[in-house]
Amino acid sequence: MAKAKFERNKPHCNIGTIGHVDHGKTTLTAAITKVLAEAGGGNTFVDYANIDKAPEERERGITISTSHVEYETETRHYAHVDCPGHADYVKNMITGAAQMDGAILVVSAADGPMPQTREHILLARQVGVPALVVFMNKVDQVDDPELLELVEMEIRELLSSYDFPGDDIPIVKGSALAALEDKNPEIGKEAILSLMAAVDEYIPQPERPLDKSFLMPIEDVFSISGRGTVVTGRVETGIVKVGEEVEIVGLRDTKKTTVTGVEMFRKLLDQGQAGDNIGALLRGTARTEVERGQVLAKPGSITPHTEFKAEVYVLSKDEGGRHTPFFANYRPQFYFRTTDVTGEITLPEDVEMVMPGDNIAFGVKLIAPIAMDPGLRFAIREGGRTVGAGVVSSIIK
């Protein structure tokens, strides 16, 4: 029989494995590819050694090691990210280098939740990972069923304490190693299939960029004699049609205007959509009323803010970051989308200073408002060089 051609006609979803060191994240990743490859559907088995030697990538100047595997179930196509070290997870989640629409939290039944289990759940909450599914691994190392129940209760309480729905989250018990070694199918292969069924069902299908509200960060502003003002940029989400009303948000008071023309590659279009680099002609807007760093957006869809809480990774000296710590009242530039805005940092009460290589949650007060929602990524810069990366976790004002 000829090999079936791989067609991506299924919805796509990005997931990853998170959890404490040595609880079995990479083994589970390999086991998923093995079990699904054997189940058919054009999947390829990727062994542990190949996932473990993750290539180093540079994202916004930060060195991150990540492994990417892909597989599909009957209902979805997945891109799955696995990181070798704890620091890689922290950097990955904060920079959004590998976007996660959901995650599989791996907890060893023998150890229960450990410090990095907590930290990864907290990070998932802070950076806005929408849903988690739990794989309780190494159940063959625990003889007492009551102990397994206790560990499950502990995991559910921990999830609830970080505002995840601990009572509802699916927890699948099994052994990733048993699945890899073709032993004990009940906790091996069957458990992996149950896990993927839970992931299919419980992790919501992400909204495609095209289906979201229109947003375009403004990169440049031109005035074209006899036509008016044109702003250019890459449409991040949604669609804008000629004749639609939009808002210009950020840096100054929000203004409404109408898009009277959309141009791409010097051709006139009826609309611009997510991914397009366009020029938008704005009715009755003076060249001086709009600037780089603002966004064009569907009216009412996004608001400007100056104060927020953020989860931040501070680059190490080796990554080209600072060589010295910084303290409260540190005033760097915050680079959002297309521009820098100065902001002042407020550290948590128990933190005196922040060292290069740290990750930390702190408050920021900008000198000018930026269009933002929780989940927006930014870089921290000093004199044009990146010294940190962050994500807005909540908006204060």
Curated annotation (Swiss-Prot):
Main location class: cytoplasm
Region (G3): 82-85
Domain called tr-type G: residue spans: 10-207
Region G1, residue ranges: 19-26
One GO cellular component, as annotated: cytosol
Spans annotated as G5: 175-177
Disulphide bridges, residue numbers: none
Pfam families: GTP_EFTU (PF00009), GTP_EFTU_D2 (PF03144), GTP_EFTU_D3 (PF03143)
Enzyme class, broadest EC rank: hydrolase
GO molecular function annotation: GTP binding; GTPase activity; guanosine tetraphosphate binding; translation elongation factor activity
InterPro entries assigned to the protein according to its UniProt record, in alphabetical order: EF-Tu_GTP-bd, EF-Tu_GTPase, EFTu-like_2, EFTU_2, G_TR_CS, P-loop_NTPase, Small_GTP-bd, T_Tr_GTP-bd_dom
Reaction it catalyzes: GTP + H2O = GDP + phosphate + H(+)
Entry annotated with the keyword Protein transport: no
Region called G2, residue ranges: 61-65
Compartments where located: Cytoplasm
Residue sites binding GTP per the record: 19-26, 82-86, 137-140
The UniProt record lists the keyword Hydrolase: yes
CDD domains listed in its UniProt record: EF_Tu, EFTU_II, EFTU_III
Secretion signal span: none
Recorded superkingdom: Bacteria
Assigned keywords, A-Z: Cytoplasm, Elongation factor, GTP-binding, Hydrolase, Magnesium, Metal-binding, Nucleotide-binding, Protein biosynthesis
Region listing for G4, in residue ranges: 137-140
Function as written in the Swiss-Prot or TrEMBL entry: GTP hydrolase that promotes the GTP-dependent binding of aminoacyl-tRNA to the A-site of ribosomes during protein biosynthesis.
PANTHER family: ELONGATION FACTOR TU, MITOCHONDRIAL, ELONGATION FACTOR TU-RELATED
Protein name (Swiss-Prot/TrEMBL): Elongation factor Tu
Source organism of this protein record: Zymomonas mobilis subsp. mobilis (strain ATCC 31821 / ZM4 / CP4)
Gene giving rise to this polypeptide: tuf
